A protein has these predicted regions:
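Right-handed parallel beta-helix
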Residues: 149, 154, 226, 232-264, 271, 303-394, ...
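Structured core elements
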Residues: 125, 229, 269, 279, ...
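Extracellular "leader-to-stem" segments immediately downstream of a signal peptide or signal-anchor
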Residues: 20-309, 313-324, 493-543
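Glycine-rich beta-solenoid repeat tracts in large extracellular/virion proteins
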Residues: 141-146, 159-192, 295-300, 319-322, ...
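Gly/Ser/Thr/Ala-enriched C-terminal appendages of enzymes
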Residues: 415-543
Length: 543
């Protein structure tokens, strides 16, 4: 077990002892208020040895083998997604007519414009029926939502509810870039600056994996509650080798990793400022070596946006071909993108006959819960891409997308909980340096060559992949090679794996209780209740 010292300070509230003169920087809009509901004390969990080691190391201020994943999701898991009471903008009032086989795109765009001009805090509501947002003559681009606290709301995603129809596919906008087809609907922050333009300060001190504090050169322009982007990286051969140890660097495959170096991106929230030391709400999911030249940047984003109670139907009915040359099978029917969002959500939605359901990109603390992917198999399900502390829960990939629910790029701190996929597919881990992913009480196939990502962007997943009480369905490949071309997972932590697949002991950090579930049954829930010292009602009420 890792036993490095850890600066675990008790949470004393949001205290500022060293704010700069320009502390009055405009702060982000607040997310919707949720009434405080009395919650009960959790019962102690005896748990397996990994859990006991986690509790002991946490109590002693030592680095834990299991990272603390409990900060994932809307409001860091501390509150449930709210049922907001915002002004309602009915798309019918802007010209939409359900079930008339005509375009409703212009009506939706007019409703979005009105809600945005009014300052957000708006529900854009669809009544029951089908609304066509991508007829033949529609432009080959996304419908953009660029604002705070804007909710797309339907009348339910089941029979008799609201259906948004993508009748025709969007086509690729970059020649030969098969994944460049625009999303149907894109929540985004338009006009974002480059990270270099948003630089705030340099990191001057080292920090252990799992700690909450960083020493910086200056706190000027920083304030309590501010979300930041922590960036670290190194092109040195030693850093790259350290990142994949104990394995050797695969120079014949990892061209991007070798040329661009180690890249770590984490979105963090300032909880306290003490001199030149920042205390963050979230734990650092990667150790910080100041010699790499770590930096902190402003995070330009929107907050409090959501989608709920809508069925999204594509029009894809061909046998799926991975990387089919036209790009339609890679990105023709992509439905939703959450880009530069925080404290947002997608819930109670269905995705039918789609190439890709949803991507959460460059975002933090977004929850996607109670969703399903159905109908014709396509390319991808729902992913966290280059995001931090995203919660993907209760997602049922019945279509068996080529890459099921998972992660890509520099995602970190992702929790995939109680998700299922068909026996013919496996969770996505799409290379380009994802780290610290908890796959918690999930079930589905466990097959090679479904993680995704060209070998030049490998490995598929770096440190701190945790498989907790995973139930394998379908055919087993026998011993799963966790370190081979297109299937490179850096020594995952495995506990309670159920299925015929086995693992080489040299390729895992631990393979505990193989064939039998471990306690706690759900690691995210146990870690959250341990941190909050209460049973979280929103989580226990999650179906």
């Amino acid at each position: 077990l890792r036993q490095l010292p850890l600066m675990l300070l008790p949470v004393l509230g949001l205290l500022s002892t060293a704010c700069s003169d320009d502390h009055n920087t405009t702060q982000e809009p607040t997310t919707p208020e949720v009434p405080n509901i009395p919650e009960s004390e959790p019962e102690p969990i005896a748990g397996c040895s990994l859990w006991q080691d986690y509790l002991a190391a946490r109590a002693n201020g030592e680095e834990t083998t299991l990272l603390d994943f409990s900060y994932a999701g809307y409001e860091h898991g501390e509150r449930g997604i709210p049922d907001v009471d915002y002004p309602v903008y009915l798309v019918e009032d802007y010209g939409a007519v359900a079930n008339d086989n005509k375009s409703d795109r212009e009506a939706l765009e007019a409703a979005i414009e009105a809600a945005t001009k009014a300052g957000g805090k708006a529900i854009i509501r669809f009544s029951a029926g089908r609304y066509d947002l991508r007829p033949a003559d529609a432009p080959n681009k996304s419908i953009i939502i660029n604002g705070d606290n804007i909710i797309l709301q339907g009348a339910g995603s089941g029979e008799g509810g609201t259906e948004i129809f993508m009748e025709y596919p969007n086509t690729i906008v970059q020649p030969n870039v098969l994944w460049s087809g625009p999303d149907l609907i894109r929540f985004t922050y338009l006009g974002a600056n480059s990270d270099n333009q948003l630089l705030l300060t340099n990191v001057t001190g080292n920090a252990a994996r799992g700690s909450h504090s960083l020493e910086v050169a200056s706190t000027s322009g920083l304030y309590i509650g501010q979300r930041l982007l922590l960036k670290g990286g190194s092109k040195s051969a030693d850093a790259i080798a350290q990142e994949v140890a104990p394995y050797d660097v695969v120079t014949s495959e990892w061209k991007t990793f070798i040329n661009e170096g180690v890249q770590v991106n984490e979105y963090l929230t300032i909880e306290r400022i003490e001199g030149n030391t920042l205390r963050f709400k979230e734990p650092l999911m990667h150790s910080v070596d100041a010699s790499w030249g770590w930096t902190l940047h402003r995070f330009q984003h929107h907050v409090g946006c959501g989608i709920e109670d809508i069925a999204f139907r594509g029009n894809f009915h061909e046998p799926y071909i991975h990387h089919e040359p036209s790009g339609i099978h890679d990105s023709g029917y992509k439905m939703i993108a959450f880009h530069r969002q925080a404290n947002g959500w997608i819930r109670r939605c269905r995705f039918i006959d789609v190439i890709e359901a949803a991507s959460v990109m460059l975002s933090a603390n977004v929850s996607v819960i109670d969703c399903s992917i159905e109908g014709q198999k396509g390319h991808a399900a729902i992913r966290s891409e280059a995001s931090s502390h995203v919660l993907l829960a209760n997602i049922n990939d019945m279509a068996g997308q080529e890459h099921s629910t998972g992660v890509s790029k520099t995602s970190i701190g992702t929790v995939i909980m109680n998700c299922t996929t068909a026996a013919t597919s496996t969770f996505e881990s799409h290379s380009s340096q994802p780290r610290a992913t908890l796959i918690d009480k999930c079930s589905g196939g466990f097959l090679p060559n479904h993680a995704g990502g060209d070998v030049t962007f490998g490995p598929n997943h770096l440190a701190d992949l945790v498989l907790w009480n995973y139930t394998e369905t379908g055919t087993s490949v026998g011993e799963f090679n966790l370190w081979t071309r297109n299937n490179r997972f850096l020594k995952p932590i495995i506990a309670g794996f159920q299925g015929a697949t086995t693992f080489n002991a040299d390729q895992v950090t631990v393979d505990l209780s193989h064939g039998t579930m471990v306690e706690p049954l759900c690691l995210y829930q146990a870690q959250l209740q341990t941190r909050l010292r209460k049973v979280t009602s929103w989580l226990t009420n999650l179906k």
